[in-house]
Amino acid sequence: MPLRILHVLDHSWPVLDGYAQRSLGIAAAQLQLGMQPSVLTSPLHQQDDPSASETFFGGVRYFRTTDGVGLAGRAVQGRWPFLRELAVMQLLRRRIVSLIKSGSYDIVHAHSPALCGQAASQAAYFCHLPFVYEIRAFWEDGVVRQKTIGTRSMRYWLGKNLETRVARRADAVVAIARPMVDDLESRGIPRAKLFHVPNGVDAARFVPQQRDAALAAQLGVGQTPTLGYLGTLFPWEGVSWLVRAAAELRKRGLVFKLLIVGDGADSAEVKKEIEETGSSSYSLFLGRVPHDQVERYYSLMDVMVYPRSSVRLTEMVTPLKPLEAMALGKAVLGSSVGGIRELIEPEVTGMLFKPGNIEDFCRQAARLLLHEDVRIALGNEARRRVLEERDWKVVVQGYEDVYEAARRNAGARS
């Protein structure tokens, strides 16, 4: 009988951010491996997808948690501080227990944030099922970088401590990056129940392709070598810095286009930087594009740049987008923060530069723009490495050990 897994998520498809993309990849690959995954989303999913309903997608069943009625519903919908979080956990816990009682599951696998983890932990213990907690990023790091809270605030302390508590109660803990595993061990989580299951990519979807001549003509790119960024524009992604660095590179006589695709909290800053550096003649900021058109825009980008700044979040967490670029056989140039160093072997599968160092960036970018043979060699090896190590079909095999440990540890506590 296939292993039946209930994935508990903050949000999921049809929302298509990095969090949802990883979840899609995991569920699809587990299904291919003969497992039976189902997905349940929290009440917060409806804030991004108000018409959410239970559905099948890609052979996987998606359940939803409504945001409720009465005080709990008002707390969620009104985003009342603290009460909203309590309501989310209460509503989600009840929904998980209801699903477990009405169906048959072998594992409850919750994914951060800790609100999902706490609700799933309580439900799994109540129903005597093994509980796995997967941490995609430390919530408190993200909100600090967005300047929502400070490191000395009560919310920061509560968030970090709840995360640690959920991890301690879990029968197995998954982290997507090695620095996160080390951090969790430093919090007292036993190394024996910590597992590293990294980010992956659907290598069957992201395949090398010819330059889209029609789109190149439409955008006025032509055959000009192009630096590209495709992803969400958070401040720590460093895209506004990239505009400044590219302006310096142009001053040195290199001819290229800078193509930026995506949106986010830093969009206004990126636009401002393009204006202040006088970069509009060669910089194209296109905003968000339809998901099914992403590969067309990738095809115009000769060098994919990931200029993350060095902060705790970027040192800890590996991004998804460089893996898409590597699967496409692109030359990748990234800042040498921990999350990117975990993906790129310098001079073999990509190039690295010192975070925030314009001189180092210009040196590496010039080399890639001027030498097509170097770009091709790096891209070919990157694609080969992704197929070997980072295709979702390969990555999800790591969950077999995770689930075995969780079932063993759950048996010991029952």
Residue ranges and their predicted role:
Residues 179, 200:
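Carbohydrate-associated surface elements
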Residues 268-295:
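Nucleotide-activated donor-binding/catalytic signature segment of Leloir-type glycosyltransferases, i.e.
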Residues 304-306, 324-327, 331-334, 344:
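Short hydrophobic beta-strand element within catalytic cores of glycosyltransferases
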Residues 1-61, 411:
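N-terminal subdomain of nucleotide-sugar transferases
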Residues 346-347, 351-358, 367-373:
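Conserved acidic donor-binding segment of nucleotide-sugar-dependent glycosyltransferases
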Residues 360, 367, 374-389, 398-401:
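A short, well-ordered alpha-helix in the C-terminal region of glycosyltransferases
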Residues 53, 207-221:
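A short helix/loop element that forms part of the nucleotide-sugar donor recognition site in Leloir-type
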Residues 6-8, 221-246:
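Conserved donor-binding/catalytic core segment of Leloir-type glycosyltransferases
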